[in-house]
């Protein structure tokens, strides 16, 4: 999500097969990102027990627990703080590599970059399958974060095969992939949490297989299918005549890239995207721990939450946003969506921490998901419309990179707030941040079509 009001992207007829492959790529990326959401507390508990008495994890958790006891915080609050730190590392890798993959795809094409990064993702899932110790799990998540920076490449490919007038509809397809991934990943994680391969084959523990290997195996299988499909069927979406130059090492630096955008509209859109992602990531960071602490939710209960979010997201981004964002305008849709998320976040904090009401929680989750759907489609359309054709990958890469930076910082901040002040305060702070993003978004320029 950025802003550039210069060269129009060429009118290229949509290629349904390529869009289908792009859709699957995004879908599987989101599965990998979200598959461990509902089992996060249980996984952390398992690793802590396994490595008790020694090792890096045991040392870190012991220090956090001593702080928790001094602050009268619960063990779940300690887990949320630690999980937030882990999530930050994953997203930090995406922040560093997203502009690199995006710019590289502008130079050599989308297809080779997608093949490389998806193969790397498959390797990360293989490591997770055999991550019987915490360091191997940590390495798998780092590699997954590096390769997960290919989201900007996939979205740039959508821009390649859609016209400017149909850009919102193309980004709606992206939104459906996000919604399905956010539905399927937690569902796989939650519904397979009880499938422990060690119960049937205990000897596999010697090879690093652990109680949570099944979700990783499923994600690995999906990733390999995706890799084979792209190898066999994906048609390059960026023709050689539309490709840009290769970037210097300095230009590939994500921090340097952020300060080399001359257009003030792009800079403002990047700021809006950073703020809204930072605020929204509070939800992803602590919802599992907050509901487990206040409502005693199990992984199966959390799976139902994520299924609800995924279904609403699919309908919103695949149907409602695709239809109404072009009519309402990208700017209005983005601001309205951010405002709705902000209001709903305050309601989520109240529903869980004060009212302890599941029906109210689901209502607020539905509203926040609708707002997020409109904001995501509208902002993705804006940044694509602002960017010149030969820099779609780079501009989208910078925008996504800022989003990943927000996701790198947000889990640690949200975990710290939850650790010190509880979930209700954390969601109220998130609400204020999101309403602030809506205020910033009101100053975005309208794109030329």
Residue ranges and their predicted role:
Residues 97-109, 316-330, 418:
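Helix-to-loop junctions at the C-terminal end of transmembrane segments
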Residues 95-134:
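Conserved MFS/SLC helix-loop-helix module at the cytosolic interface between two early adjacent transmembrane helices
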Residues 139-178:
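Cytoplasmic helix-loop-helix junction between adjacent transmembrane helices
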Residues 5-16, 235-272, 294:
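Juxtamembrane intracellular "pre-TM" segments in multi-pass secondary transporters
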Residues 39-80, 285-302:
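Short amphipathic helix-loop junctions that connect adjacent transmembrane helices
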Residues 331-379:
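C-terminal transmembrane helical hairpin of 12-TM major facilitator-type secondary transporters
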Residues 220-240, 440-444:
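C-terminal membrane-cytosol helix-exit motif in multi-pass small-molecule transporters
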Residues 109, 130-135, 296, 351-355:
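Helix-breaking motifs and short loop linkers at transmembrane-helix boundaries and internal kinks
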